[in-house]
Amino acid sequence: NALKIDWETIVPKDRLSYIIGNPPFVGSKYSTPEQKKDMDVVFSPYTKKYRKLDFVASWYLLASKFMEGTSIKSAFVSTNSIMQGEQISILWPLIFDMGNEIDFVYKSFIWNNDANLKAHVHCIIVGFSSTSVTTNKVIYDNGSESKVSNINAYQIKAENIFIESRNKSISGAKPMIAPNKPCDYNHLKIEATEYDDFIKSSPESAKWIKRMVGAKEFIQNKERYCLWLVGITPKELRSMPIVLDRVEKCREARINANTSESLKLANTPTLFREQLNPDKYLIIPCVSSERRKYVPIGFLDDKTIPVMGTLIVPDATLYDFGILTSNVHMAWMRTVAGRLEMRYRYSAQIVYNNFPWPKVTEAQKEKISKTAQAILDARALYPESSLADLYDELTMPVELRRAHQANDKAVMEAYGMTKVVDGKKTWLTESETVARLFEMYEESTKN
């Protein structure tokens, strides 16, 4: 077991030049009890948060410790999540504090297991060594390579800054919150295929039914409904036997689940766990395809109930929408967000709350509000198209693309993200944009 033995008993440091390999691909949620014990031994002297790390992180820490004071170089094929989202700020400060730097990174690719064609893992290859060993760093990405002065844990050319999980926006932006969690065991939900029959059998129930939207329903324009019984009287409930039956089954399911939370919720069987129903809000899907340039976000009102798989910003404005749907925010999201396989995993704690908003004039704010409205207007030209179709790079309408480009320019101007090349004003590249945002983040959080 490589995590239990003293590596120097196998090869003395002074006889070793390289440590390379592909340690086991095991995500943090899938580690066996034995693997968890191994990680306890490796990480407990350094951090208490290691249970959120993938198993492969153990090899990174042991190699870093082993290489101290040597010219040894290490490289591992790894699950890509060790350089995504929350894991970054747990693992990589430990490695850098031991005097190591990233020498190269080969960005995400799929590792297929020939023995089991269903087994494929999204991987990266990371090379690292003492700060004094390698001066030329290289980023390998989609067939290209970039030589840079420093590679940080977000796989970009930037200083070694770490994005911490936060409960509030560093810029004072409106709170982004989790939506409703029904905890109804599907008894308060009404599928699209059930809706017509449900209404026919109980026409008076229509006033108590609202559309329910998770990420799939929002992006793919799928219809799904729920009983939203906030404020219903006992008399009204008893007048609708089909609704009362659903409520009774919800109560029974919560009791049978027999957890402290479900038993408490059994006392309110007419209700979801939360009763969030804002008049107007922005909705953001938590997981979205990496093939999209823009994560589809949009406005909904109190006729629609947001549920798990999304995040919401109540009382958001057009200006808020313009900033969040811009290429600036998307560049930030692509860099700091976690991933599900390769799909973006948007979070309030990492992506939204750490995002540096610009300091804008009223004129800039008004301009961004107008370009944001133009995006909504362009979508409205295609009422039969889902956001999945509108934001597919192959089928995105030209009006929508142009509206986004105009919004991108307005937002970049507000950030001052322009430069002069050959006497002409142009925009920062995505990597330059992210580097600037990291500088803004550091400035906002240094105190």
Language-model features, listed with the residues they occupy:
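Polybasic, glycine- and aromatic-enriched phosphate-binding surface used to engage nucleic acids
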Residues: A57, V133, N142-K370, E443-N447
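Active-site-adjacent structural elements in folded domains
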Residues: Y60, A337-M342, E393-E399
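Signature of N6-adenine DNA methyltransferases within the class I
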Residues: K4-P203, Q220-N221, P234-R238, D301-T310, ...
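A generic secondary-structure signal for well-formed alpha-helical elements
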Residues: P23, G27, M67, S71, ...
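Conserved acidic residues
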Residues: N1
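Non-catalytic DNA-recognition/assembly elements of restriction-modification systems
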Residues: I242-C250, W357-N447
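Short coil/turn segments at secondary-structure junctions
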Residues: Y46-T47, G231, L394-V398
